Amino acid sequence: HLLVGLLYNIEYIAKSKGQAELSPLTHQNDIFQRLISLVNTYSKTERNVSFYANKLCLTPRYLNTVIRQTSQQTVMDWINQSIILEAKVLLKHSNRLVYQISDELNFPNPSFFSKFFKRMTGMTPQEYQKN
């Protein structure tokens, strides 16, 4: 799956940027890798940190702490990145219209999707699709 590969590349980049000190923290790295796997599987439908924390048998606060220590990003950042990567792939490599992509990614409406996409990328879905 393309999205899985992209997220693992992001993880690799995060680890290679001066985070060698994290290698002994195998439990934290394990939690991080399990979170990424869950985000890849469920981010289209589940955008609540509590969902992922429950799947990992952790509290949302502890999960966020571990993920922030491991990657300098929050769980929500990883969820949003996954959604944006999926949206970008669909916008560039499918013939779907924005409202169809919005539906596929389970946004309440195309307007909400467009605002989210613009907030995350700095451009509208239509602008991204054209470039």
Model-derived features with residue positions:
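Terminal helix-turn-helix DNA-binding modules in bacterial transcription factors
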Residues: 69-111, 130-131
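Short, Lys/Arg-enriched, Trp-marked, Pro/Gly-tolerant hinge/linker segments that flank
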Residues: 11-37, 41-51, 55, 69-77, ...
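Alpha-helical residues within helix-turn-helix
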Residues: 50-51, 62, 100
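Core residues of bacterial helix-turn-helix
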Residues: 56, 105-106, 117
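…primarily DNA-binding HTH/wHTH and HhH modules…
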Residues: 115-131
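Short, residue-level hotspots on alpha-helical faces of the histone-fold
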Residues: 1-9, 81-85
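Short hydrophobic/aromatic patch on the recognition helix
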Residues: 63-64, 112-113, 117
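Long amphipathic alpha-helical coiled-coil segments
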Residues: 54, 58-64
